[in-house]
Amino acid sequence: RRIMGDTIVPTIPIMVNTYYPPNQPTLNRCYELGRQIRAAVEALPGDARVGVIASGGLSHFVVDEEIDGITMKALREKDREALTSMPRERLNSGTSEIRNWIAMAGATEHLDHEWSDYVPSYRSKAGTGCGMGFGIWS
């Protein structure tokens, strides 16, 4: 509200079961979901400006800078193969939310990467915390 005031922004939340087996989607299915979201947006009448937001962390509850780095590099380079071939066993617990980023990659594959950053945010000496990714495609 601080930025938008009372402006109402139409929003369609799409929830992906990243966390609970046995029906977590495959990484390829997440990418395809993103492509279908893009197709639906492109089919809208008019010239509405649409934002796609992936929520969720990269790695957490234990920070995994390696898998976060693979993800961020693949997002920057539009490397679908790298995004969809990550080992599923690495995408457990909170790290499973990388699936949301993969869906976003499918929706934005036609856009140019402008900026991204990664901050590994540790909260304990045991390595717990969250890998925080940020990016802009337009």
Where are the predicted features?
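Beta-strand elements within well-structured catalytic alpha/beta cores of enzymes
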Residues: 14, 48-56
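Flexible, D/E/H-enriched segments
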Residues: 1-35, 40-43, 63-138
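Phosphate/ribose-phosphate-bearing ligand recognition and processing surfaces
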Residues: 57-61
